[in-house]
Amino acid sequence: MSKAAKKKSSKKRSGSEAAQFDQKTIQEFKEAFGIMDQNKDGIIDKSDLKDLYASMGQIAPDSQIDAMIKEASGPINFTVFLTLFGERLTGTDPEATIIGAFAMFDKKDCGKIKEDDLIKILQNKRGEPLDEDEVKAMYKGKPPIEGGEVDYKAFAHLITTGAQDELASA
């Protein structure tokens, strides 16, 4: 097989992206899937995503929800969910992943979210919420908050590297 043919064949969707995860990670994805599958029917659909956003105090436009659903080749069961994440996370910078998650709450698309929204996100009762002590510990790390808004790109950098000083020189 030629080098070009090998390269081309490696880009095909194999469905084996999920094989890259260890059991602990798969369990974490199961928990996340369970949170997203609001009606507990084993399929994440438009209604589930709308309910998930609503539970976080957000209203997602239908176009955004439809775009998410279209990323899957069919109904989003756990296997499809895991495959989608496998495709997304292959070669993805964890910092970029965190930024993408926070960007969902950036209503103004300005790189910042309200501090109150950050606390709501971190203390959301779905998933693994932070308790008061964990939130206090987060503040000891001096998150980039100014005027009641969090620079979530800088915060993601702080989370992934622990280095706030590097931001000033970047």
Curated annotation (Swiss-Prot):
Composition bias, Basic residues: 1-13
Domain called EF-hand: residue spans: 24-59, 93-128
Protein name: Myosin regulatory light chain 1
InterPro entries: EF-hand-dom_pair (IPR011992), EF_Hand_1_Ca_BS (IPR018247), EF_hand_dom (IPR002048), Myosin_RLC (IPR050403)
Entry GO CC: cytoplasm; muscle myosin complex; myosin II complex
One MF annotation (Gene Ontology) recorded for this entry: myosin heavy chain binding
Record organism: Caenorhabditis elegans
Region (Disordered): 1-22
Subunit structure: Myosin is a hexamer of 2 heavy chains and 4 light chains (two regulatory light chains and two essential light chains).
